[in-house]
């Protein structure tokens, strides 16, 4: 299965609480933090919800 590298590029300060929970659900904690996740529909939905905070790289 394909993987996606997700990097947080903006702060979570002042964001909607639901968006902060989505960041934590992806495993992101601070600016510049990157994680590698499987490319699944649920992960894609989380990315779409907070795409303005993230940088995505297909692997």
From Swiss-Prot:
The keyword Nucleotide-binding does not apply. It comes from the Bacteria. GO terms for cellular component: cytosolic large ribosomal subunit. GO terms for biological process: translation. CDD domains: Ribosomal_L30. GO terms for molecular function: structural constituent of ribosome. Keywords: Ribonucleoprotein, Ribosomal protein. Part of the 50S ribosomal subunit. Belongs to the universal ribosomal protein uL30 family. This is Large ribosomal subunit protein uL30. It comes from Buchnera aphidicola subsp. Schizaphis graminum (strain Sg). The gene is rpmD.
